[in-house]
Design a protein with these regions (language model features):
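Short loop/turn segments immediately following beta-strands, especially the blade-tip
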Residues: 33-40, 77-86, 124-134, 175-182
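Short loop/turn segments immediately following the C-termini of beta-strands
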Residues: 16, 25-26, 35, 70-71, ...
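A short beta-strand motif characteristic of beta-propeller blades
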Residues: 1, 42-48, 88-94, 134-145, ...
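Residue position within the beta-strands of beta-propeller blades
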Residues: 21-22, 67-68, 114, 164
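Structural signal for beta-propeller blades
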Residues: 28-30, 73-75, 120-122, 170-172
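Beta-propeller domains
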Residues: 23-29, 37-40, 47-99
Length: 202
């Protein structure tokens, strides 16, 4: 990251040794780092994000990077390779929701979901084998976290369930993921602290 104020949003190691990815929300850039044989990282290769404010992301097992765009209200997908190649597949697919900050891909790689902190909602995308994205619901609302909802993060388990950390209502909402990507509410864990900021499922 060459910029002095990149405001990095997320960092993650890509599957299959494809390298390290960092989103810069302050510069609308995405950085990729390849691994050297000794485990250190090559210099960053910087790429322009398809939309403004790239934020949360996830990477499928086949190397498809899907990134939320918090200001644009959208998500984009990109192709990654072990040699550091980076190309846009689907650019800025809008969901008409506000502040889609965090994103997760299902374990089978078929769907991606964004947590829309400013709209009390979750948006779902179909993720095709070629990495292209298609919005599941025309209005962008695959699920709602209810009045005062503020989903800050999302996670999925290996049994086709999605969990949303709702800081507005201080709960963790659980949803079953249908065969076509629909989300059906199945649980709500109450009494969570106001300071909660992240969630993981396993």
């Amino acid at each position: 990251m060459r910029n002095t104020r990149p405001s990095a949003a997320q960092v993650a190691i890509a599957p299959r040794g494809l390298g390290v990815v960092v989103t810069e929300k302050g510069t609308s850039l995405i950085d990729t780092f390849s691994f050297r044989h000794n485990g250190t990282l090559d210099s960053a290769v910087t790429h322009a994000s398809s939309g403004s404010t790239p934020y949360g992301f996830d990477i499928s097992q086949n190397g498809t990077l899907v990134v939320s765009e918090a200001v644009a209200g959208a998500a984009s997908s990109y192709s990654l390779t072990a040699r550091g190649a980076f190309s846009t597949i689907s650019g800025s697919i809008g969901d008409d929701q506000k502040a889609p900050c965090w994103l997760v891909i299902t374990k089978d790689g078929r769907f991606a979901y964004t947590a829309n902190a400013g709209s009390s909602s979750i948006s779902g995308y179909k993720l095709d084998h070629d990495g292209s994205l298609q919005l599941l619901d025309s209005n962008g609302v695959t699920a709602s976290t209810g009045e005062n909802g503020k989903p800050l993060d999302v996670a999925v388990d290996h049994n086709q369930h999605l969990y949303a950390l709702d800081a507005g209502n201080h709960v963790i909402d659980g949803f079953a993921i249908g065969n076509a990507g629909a989300l059906t509410p199945v649980s709500s864990t109450t009494g969570m602290p106001e300071t909660m900021v992240g969630i993981a499922a396993f």
